Amino acid sequence: MLTLVLGGAASGKSEYAESLVLRTTGPRYYLATMQVWDAECAARVEKHRKMRAAKQFETMECPLHLDNVRLPARGTALLEDLGNLAANELYDPAGAGENAAKAILHGLESLAAQCENLIVVSNEVFSGGADYAGDTGRYLLALAQVNNAFAARADAVVRVVCGIPVYYKGVEK
């Protein structure tokens, strides 16, 4: 099953996505896309890693090249999040650059083929308007392209607002 969980900053989307994973059986993979730039980032990553360990997640770092990820066994994968991955692929010199959306979608297809459930967390884009230029505009367009394409293929699309899940496609399981 493919699920897209969208929401604004601090909307509760990540917590909701984790709750979906905790309803499943079998291996649980947390695919972390945040790049570690400094000690503060490293501390944040370690804190989150410890929190997920109690929930029986195996954490896999994948800030770039999602199509290179190989899951050890079928199970449920939680990708956190498309916003970081899009920025990394667009702007990291080792990333896909202008082909970021295409590379991410290819990676999502690869992941979907490897697991029973793929739950993807992403940021809501363009709800504050669509008049952005330069790097910001390119980033938002790439993320919107990935969101739209994955939503079309997903079994469930849910937006989390103030911690409340609202289903646009599929039903809560």
Question: For the regions a protein language model found, what residue spans apply to each?
Answer:
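Conserved P-loop
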Residues: 2-72
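Generic beta-sheet signal
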Residues: 3-5, 28, 75-84, 118-120
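Short, glycine/serine-rich, charged loops/turns that create anion-binding
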Residues: 10, 35, 83, 125-126
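Short, functional N-terminal and low-complexity linear motifs
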Residues: 12-18, 76-77, 110-118
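Residue-level signal for inorganic ion chemistry
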Residues: 17, 48, 78, 123, ...
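Short, hinge-like loop/turn segments at secondary-structure boundaries
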Residues: 47-49, 77, 137-139
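Helix-adjacent hinge/juxtasegments
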Residues: 55-100
